[in-house]
Regions:
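Residue-level recognition of tetratricopeptide repeat
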Residues: 84, 91, 125, 159, ...
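Structural motif corresponding to the intra-repeat A-B loop/turn of tetratricopeptide repeats
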Residues: 89, 93-96, 130, 164, ...
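Start-of-helix register in tetratricopeptide repeats
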Residues: 77, 84, 118, 152, ...
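Short coil turns that delineate tetratricopeptide repeat
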Residues: 73, 114, 148, 181-182, ...
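Canonical tetratricopeptide repeat
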Residues: 81, 122, 156, 189, ...
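N-terminal leader/linker segments that initiate helical-solenoid repeat arrays
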Residues: 2-118, 138, 426-427, 433-444
């Protein structure tokens, strides 16, 4: 199972970024008519903060926009709004088939209005969701050139820069973003960049600011609070993590990210059956790959290999669906295969391809672990060192580094990495936490 690190969750749907990345507040070019102005305001209020969620659903918004377009097929603003609504629907359901609908709506908007800032930015967000980070960066830069004073594009640009390993540039982008508009979207991204650089306290502080800046009942606030809970989990603070997950569920009883988080808390506490119940609930609502993998790992840990294999087969089916809708799953599947001893030689090739497309610390870690699993420990160590270059307090990456050092016979380094991994979070992985402890005992 992957660690509950902020990145892995932020990134599995940086498996995503549209399924899981924040839909930021976007400023529209308002038309002179009051009717159009009202329509744009309504759409942005809904899509940005979900503050109108108590009065309307995404389906209602989509239906309304489709009806407008039937009577006025040249209405580029409605096409742009519809594209954003489809992105939100993908976020709510985890259904990647909405990506093609998003692309079609946004491309129609751009065909009618080639310099539409919002549609360009949203095209970038769609590219992020599909893990085409170079394209996302290109779309974001195009949008920024049109209007450098609006913030939506900066979020797209920063997310792409992070996934492309351009961390210094991402810091500069986010500083500009927060200077222009200090809000939930910029705060949460700054939290993430702090986490990547090993400043966990600073990440927690900024994520709390992001939570406090949100509308209490908004889905976006639920998402950010769940990220706050994940940060607490990643440092081994199960009580605070559970508190934040439960606060999320008070306003959103079926919020899958919080349900899955509680499942991991229960797993860490040794309550496997309750953990399975929570993750089963999450998978039933939204079969996201990370939920399905975690559930399979729990079944495996409980000795129910048949149920585990059923979940792992589902991962393969989900991969097929994602790829059919333009989502690059190379890195995620490489990690999954390496963790579960599947097609190891092919997995190395997949991990190399993933790293070439997204040369981030996460891509380096995936390649290191794939190489480890075929016994190429020296090359694995090179990429593992790269994965740790920012000082990220990620127990799984440290575990990988420790096991690589162990196989290379460097006992002191192996012990140091494994001790640090367990000191940060002794519950970091269902698959590997106990193995880390056993290996430390051998080293002692």
């Amino acid at each position: 199972m992957q660690t509950l690190s902020q990145h892995r969750w932020y990134h599995r749907v940086l498996l995503l970024v549209v399924i899981t990345a924040l839909i930021v507040i976007v400023s529209w070019r308002l038309a002179s008519t009051q009717g159009l102005s009202s329509r744009l305001e309504d759409a942005y209020g809904y899509l940005a903060n979900s503050s109108s969620r108590t009065n309307a659903s995404t389906d209602t918004l989509i239906g309304s926009l489709q009806e407008r377009l039937r009577t006025n097929p040249q209405d580029w603003q409605s096409f742009s709004q519809l594209g954003l609504a489809y992105l939100q629907k993908a976020r709510e359901t985890g259904d990647p088939t909405y990506y093609q609908k998003t692309e079609e709506a946004l491309d129609k908007a751009l065909a009618l209005q080639s310099d539409d800032y919002v549609s360009m930015s949203a095209r970038g967000a769609l590219a992020l969701a599909r893990h085409d980070f170079s394209a996302a960066l290109e779309w974001g830069e195009k949008a920024r050139q049109i209007n450098p004073d609006r913030t939506y594009a900066y979020g797209v640009i920063a997310d792409a820069q992070i996934e492309l390993g351009r961390y210094e540039e991402a810091v500069e982008t986010l500083q500009t973003m927060v200077d222009l508009r200090p809000d939930m979207s910029s705060y949460s991204r700054i939290s993430y960049i702090r986490e990547l650089h090993g400043d966990v306290d600073g990440a927690l502080e900024m994520m709390q600011v992001a939570v406090d800046s949100g509308t209490p009942n908004a889905e976006s606030t639920a998402w950010v609070r769940t990220q706050l809970a994940n940060l607490y989990f990643n440092r081994g603070d199960l009580d605070q993590a559970e508190l934040e997950y439960r606060l999320t569920l008070q306003n959103h009883p079926d919020y899958v990210y919080a349900l899955a988080g509680l499942g991991r808390v229960r797993a860490a506490q040794g309550e496997r059956q309750e953990a399975i119940q929570y993750l089963n609930q999450a998978v039933t609502i939204m079969p996201m790959p990370e939920f399905v993998i975690a559930l399979g790992d729990l079944y495996q840990a409980a000795g129910d290999q048949e149920s585990a294999d059923q979940q792992y087969q589902l991962v393969t089916a989900i991969e097929t669906l994602y790829r059919a809708n333009g989502v690059d799953m190379d890195m995620e599947i490489a990690l999954f295969n390496a963790d579960h001893d599947r097609n190891l030689e092919e997995t190395v090739a997949l991990a190399r391809k993933a790293y070439a497309n997204r040369p981030s610390i996460h891509g380096a870690d995936a390649l290191a672990w794939a190489l480890f699993n075929i016994g190429d420990y020296e090359e694995a160590q090179q990429y593992s060192a790269e994965a740790l270059k920012l000082g990220t307090k990620d127990s799984l990456k440290l575990f990988h580094a420790g096991m690589i050092a162990f196989e290379l016979g460097d006992k002191a380094e192996a012990r140091a990495y494994l001790e640090e991994a367990l000191a940060i979070n002794p519950y970091f992985s269902i698959l590997y936490a106990e193995e880390a402890q056993r290996t430390l005992e051998i080293l002692k």
